[in-house]
Curated annotation (Swiss-Prot):
Any one of the GO BP annotations: isoleucyl-tRNA aminoacylation
Cited InterPro entries: aa-tRNA-synth_I_CS, aa-tRNA-synth_Ia, Anticodon_Ile_BEm, Ile-tRNA-ligase, Ile-tRNA-ligase_type1, Ile-tRNA_ligase, M/V/L/I-tRNA-synth_anticd-bd, Rossmann-like_a/b/a_fold
Positions of short motif 'KMSKS' region: 602-606
Binding positions for Zn(2+) per the UniProt entry: C900, C903, C920, C923
Substrates-to-products reaction catalysed: tRNA(Ile) + L-isoleucine + ATP = L-isoleucyl-tRNA(Ile) + AMP + diphosphate
A Pfam cross-reference name: zf-FPG_IleRS
One CC-aspect GO term: cytosol
Subcellular location: Cytoplasm
Protein name: Isoleucine--tRNA ligase
Species in which this protein is naturally found: Photorhabdus laumondii subsp. laumondii (strain DSM 15139 / CIP 105565 / TT01) (Photorhabdus luminescens subsp. laumondii)
Family that this chain belongs to: Belongs to the class-I aminoacyl-tRNA synthetase family. IleS type 1 subfamily.
Length: 937
């Protein structure tokens, strides 16, 4: 028996079947950075229209987690896909470097400033620590395949950036948005500092829920409002609170002007309660019998006075819209120093802003004898005892509720009135302007707009001052007596900024006031407050986007972060940009959800369900992680588990195998020498290129809409359905058995080449390492890297007016699917082992029969059978099976003739040529003749 193996065009490629990504990717990275790939891309894209994604800076503390990976991979996909779409899309990664978490870490290492180290030395240690953390995170981000200017990232602790943060504050002051006041702010007693809204998390906490009597000072006057005479018993207004420790700071009781209040008589006393809440109060207090003596509107009780249960002063009734009927008594204990609503109401009525609590959360001396020096949360029980002793406690129970906690310490926080600096929301119209700007931004998903609008509508003034060591100084001078800002504040801040640009933030603490103020220094003091870290990152649209030459003075096109950043970075950036520029800092805002495990649970070290991106990369490779991110609908929760990653690895293999098939069958193909003109190609080959053209249009559109999971689905459909289960199956015969330089084979290779050129570009934004690998195996002259390219422009398709147009091949796909069902059953019944052992008869109506017959003898190649006959639908016998195509029945039988050992087809003409006695006539033509001709498939 002769060996005809060397007459076949067997596939061959250096592109391995196994990705072995964990080992191969690090070597690719070395080449990328040796070649300075990021700069290569910048040079290639120079002069193109810019697309700017501004990186929200991660905090420079700790290793990156799976959420960081999601965020950075999504950004990288956008950057790379925009490059493919013809944009110059630079990426400047950044880090948030100041703030409390780093201070706490450094305190653990060297102690608090002032103990063994000066504040200046402490800041230097903080800077050093942040730098070390950045290097660790940077290494992991690079390992993910994220391309960016890693040699020149932006850091909020860069001297120039620190100076520009100070300049941003000066512009806010110049535009009239800065406000100073003793307002209640979120205060962490562990941090001993105010917290921003974004630094507050909510956890369940059990608190005492109490109803407290405030006895009427003038019961006669009170009862008159209810239209009744004063009874003999005491009359009290009942308030409800879950923070007994705030009662020493009570200065009023708030009612709603329009609510109906009732004077209710119970055994031994009369109570004033909101009419709608009387029953619930009585029920929880265990009171079964009561009589309503009278009623009046809340407004009728305004400014009537009630005795504080134990502080020895009176509390007036004030009216506030924040009073609700959701719970409680309809009367709200009001402590202007311990709550924003209380503060606003207190301002309206001129109430004292009492703050009896120190920075450590303990009562100040002189508050109340048994409370002085006690921590507020421990004081709750003492306050309850005092209330009981004074017969003021109507009812006590425990309530589990959501309570604000410090994001760092996870401990409950308090509202505490302290002198602070604020960006005012209403002093100069910032709230109104911000709400207007929100409307001009595209929010993805769309619900983001309503969310941030609600936040802006309801947010208090932004407290931007902090009493910390490691942060950008506010750089302000205030008058010793009036506490007014220096009249030359803007000019002075610029002088400070110039010094900070040279020496960093330490320049402010080293500065002697006289150096800038001269004789004025005697009347002014330096403010040592630092800026909220959210001010640092929120001003990077000015300190980074406006300043870096790569961005060419353009505003950011998109901000992309987790959905928690509506109240964080998106908010602070919007506030600062609107305050200094009068416009939003972004055109689009895209948010992604948080990572959860396969059961939808939040990632937690205590549960043990965390997945480390480093472990995934070491085991599976970064491209699997990237494909998982791209495959997920990131607008909701993003599930990850070993099983989910395994599915991503399976999907990866299908894409890799498609790429490998293309490359292996381009062996010996030079696009410059061997490409076939479209009009000379087999129709099926042109159809396949047209499929790629349609897929590319869909994929490019989805990339543009940031719809990456649909990109992956479309790519998988193309690889698995249009190519894998149809086209690539069909062409194997022609590719392997036709003469190597025949038109039939070169037509096929031309199609494969165009498809590979397109596919590698679709892959590049997501499967960056694999795309680079494919790119280096593709034949022909090309740029060094796929990342400098644009969507492939060499695709073409079938004309709609052609007989064998896309609709024709869609029908053929359907017919082949029905034939496959019959052959699968025959295989299951052990009638055949391979479809080439089969002959099929297709009984079709005239319209379908004409289509099938138009392919002539090449129909068998489309169906992967050795023989096929097309017959009239009405002639079908009982052996023919009705298909799901109404006009088609299919009959199966074993193929006639013998098996050709070269092409494996069964044919009657095997052995008719003596010199090649084992071959079919077609193979003889391909081996010893001019080669077969293929017009269609």
């Amino acid at each position: 028996m002769s060996d005809y193996k060397n007459t076949l065009n067997l596939p061959e490629t250096g592109f391995p079947m196994r990705g072995d990504l964990a080992k191969r990717e690090p070597n690719m990275l070395k080449r990328w950075y040796k070649d300075e790939l990021y700069q290569v891309i910048r040079k290639a894209k120079a002069g193109k229209k810019t697309f700017i994604l501004h990186d929200g800076p991660p905090y420079a503390n700790g290793s990156i987690h799976i959420g960081h990976s999601v965020n950075k991979i999504l950004k990288d996909i956008i950057i790379k896909s925009k490059g493919m779409a013809g944009y110059d899309s630079p990426y400047i990664p950044g880090w948030d470097c100041h703030g409390l978490p780093i201070e706490l870490k450094v305190e653990q290492i060297i102690g608090k400033p002032g103990e063994k180290f000066s504040a200046a030395e402490f800041r230097a240690e903080c800077r050093k620590y942040a730098k070390e953390q950045i290097e660790g995170q940077k290494k992991d981000f690079i390992r993910l395949g994220i391309l960016g200017d890693w040699e020149r990232p932006y850091l909020t602790m860069d001297f120039k950036t620190e100076a520009d943060i100070i300049r941003a504050l000066s512009r806010i002051i110049a535009n009239g948005h800065l406000l100073k006041g003793a307002k209640p702010v979120h205060w962490c007693t562990d941090c001993r500092s105010s917290l921003a809204e974004a630094e507050v998390e909510y956890y369940d906490k059990t608190s005492p829920s109490i109803d407290v009597r405030f006895n009427a000072v003038d019961a006669v006057a009170v009862c008159e409002k209810f239209g009744v005479q004063a009874p003999e018993q005491p009359v009290s207004l009942v308030i409800w609170t879950t923070t007994p420790w705030t009662l020493p700071a009570n200065r009023a009781i708030a009612l709603h002007a329009e609510f109906n209040y009732q004077l209710v008589q119970i055994e031994g006393e009369c109570l004033i309660l909101a009419a709608d809440l009387v029953e619930s109060v009585m029920q929880r207090a265990g009171i079964t019998s009561w009589t309503v003596l009278g009623h009046c509107a809340g407004s009728a009780l305004e400014l009537l006075r009630f005795k504080h249960p134990f502080m020895g002063f009176d509390s007036p009734v004030v009216l506030g819209d924040h009073v609700t009927l959701d719970a409680g008594t309809g009367a709200v204990h009001t402590a202007p120093g311990h709550g924003p609503d209380d503060f606003v109401l207190g301002q309206k009525y001129g109430l004292e802003v009492a703050n009896p609590v120190g920075p450590n959360g303990c009562y100040l001396p002189g508050t109340y004898p048994s409370l002085d020096g006690m921590f507020v949360f421990k004081a709750n029980d003492v306050v309850l005892n005092i209330l009981s002793e004074n017969n003021a406690l109507l009812h006590l129970e425990k309530l589990q509720h959501s309570y604000p906690c410090c994001w760092r310490h996870k401990t409950p926080i308090i509202f505490r009135a302290t002198p602070q600096w604020f960006v005012s929301m209403d002093q100069n119209g910032l709230r109104k302007q911000s709400l207007q700007e929100i409307k001009g931004v595209q929010w993805i998903p769309g619900w983001g707009q309503a969310r941030i609008e609600a936040m802006v509508e309801n947010r208090p003034d932004w407290c931007i001052s902090r009493q910390r060591t490691w942060g950008t100084p506010m750089s302000l001078f205030v008058h010793k007596e009036t506490e007014e800002l220096h009249p030359r504040t803007i000019e002075l801040m610029e002088e400070v900024a110039k010094r900070v640009e040279v020496d960093g933030i330490q320049a402010w603490w080293d500065l002697e006031p006289a150096e800038l103020l001269g004789d004025d220094a005697a009347n002014y003091v330096k403010i040592f407050d630092t800026l909220d870290v959210w001010f640092d990152s929120g001003s990077t649209h000015a300190s980074v986007v406006d300043a870096r030459p790569e961005f060419q003075g353009n505003a950011a096109d998109i901000y992309l972060e987790g959905s928690d950043q509506h109240r964080g970075w998106f908010m602070s950036s919007l506030m600062i940009s609107t305050a200094i520029k009068g416009k939003a800092p972004y055109r689009q805002v895209l948010t992604h959800g948080f990572t959860v495990d396969g059961q939808g649970r939040k990632m937690s070290k205590s549960i043990g369900n965390t997945i480390s991106p480093q472990d995934v990369m070491d085991k599976l490779g970064a491209d699997i992680l990237r494909l998982w991110v791209a495959s997920t609908d990131y607008t909701g929760e993003i599930a990850v588990s070993d099983e989910i990653l395994k599915r991503s690895a399976d999907a990866y293999r299908r894409i890799r195998n498609t790429a490998r098939f293309l490359l292996a069958n381009l062996n010996g193909f030079d696009p410059e020498q061997h490409s076939v003109k479209p009009e000379e190609m087999a129709v099926l080959d042109r159809w396949a290129v047209g499929c790629a053209q349609a897929a590319q249009a869909d994929i490019a559109k989805c990339y543009d809409k940031y719809d990456f999971h649909t990109v992956v689905q479309r790519m998988m459909q193309f690889c698995s359905v249009e190519m894998g289960s149809f086209y690539l199956d069909i062409i194997k015969d022609r590719q392997y058995t036709a003469k190597s330089d025949s038109l039939a084979r070169r037509s096929c290779q031309t199609a494969l080449y165009h498809i590979a050129e397109a596919l590698v570009r679709w892959m590049a934004p997501i499967l960056s390492f694999t795309a680079d690998e494919v790119w280096n195996e593709l034949p022909g002259k090309r740029a060094q890297y796929v990342f400098t390219e644009e969507w492939y422009g060499g695709l073409f398709g079938l004309a709609a007016g052609e007989l064998m147009n896309d609709a024709f091949w869609a029908d053929l796909l359907a017919v082949r699917g029905e034939v496959n069902k019959v052959l699968e059953q025959a295989r299951a019944d052990k009638h055949i082992r391979s479809s080439l052992e089969a002959a099929v008869t297709l009984y079709a109506d005239n319209e379908l029969a004409d289509k099938l017959n138009s392919l002539g003898d090449e129909l068998r190649f489309v169906l992967l059978t050795s023989q096929v006959v097309v017959a009239d639908y009405e002639q079908a016998g009982e052996d023919a099976q009705q298909s799901e195509i109404g006009s088609l029945k299919i009959a199966f039988r074993k193929a006639d003739g013998e098996k050709c050992p070269r092409c494996w087809h069964y044919a009657k003409d095997v052995g008719l040529v003596a010199e090649h006695a084992e071959l079919c006539g077609r193979c003889v033509t391909n081996v010893a003749g001019n080669g077969e001709e293929r017009k269609f498939a």
